[in-house]
């Protein structure tokens, strides 16, 4: 049996859809069954309710599981939540845990979530379980959050200066996550994934423009303006502060400005370009019907 957690989130839902499309049996762990209503009638999907942060709730989800892919919400309790899941997986006899981590899981980062991912990776590797760390870069889907200003003002307001980033389509990552869960292997491996291009925000705005058929301009703002905008949109201050540190780190360049297609070659996956992503999501970005 294989188990997928986080199946109602951004990445987890894409991975769940891969299982549905390929008709491969999978068990998914959700806190709220209602959020997985679209999967209720899929004969190859077993839905189990439980909370990754509450070990006592995880027995039914982990019973008979050989491999599990671990994803949880990016919040300030992520280390505690995922460590609890790792402990429960070990106690229930799970053999192999695949952690959905991040490219910024490294000791020299100042980004709190990168440091959290690294701490969890170390905990998993010390647990005695077989492990795999899947490390994608930031998602192209993050730019969909900018759709309101793109639609209203024809502007992409971000605090990223002239830096280049290597965003990846979540659907590409989901294909690798699916294959790791279905087939196993790649044990004690750290698997990086990036998009096929390192792009400035001007270049990203250009690709959105081409996809929707009207001009979108990149308008640089300050990191503090970005932080205040996040808070104004309901992002909790600790999360906004963490993202502020990520922005300041991205402005320095580094690993998120580099392209690495080695994982795609191993798994034989054709990378999605940002233009292809923008064309597929043109309506969301405000293209005329």
Residue map of PLM features:
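A hydrophobic C-terminal alpha-helical subdomain
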Residues: 14, 224-289
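Catalytic metal- and UDP-sugar-binding loop of GT-A-like glycosyltransferases, i.e.
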Residues: 71
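Oxidoreductase cofactor-interface core, primarily capturing Rossmann-like NAD(P)-dependent enzymes
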Residues: 1-39, 53-65, 74-83, 87-96, ...
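Rossmann-fold cofactor-recognition segment
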Residues: 41-53
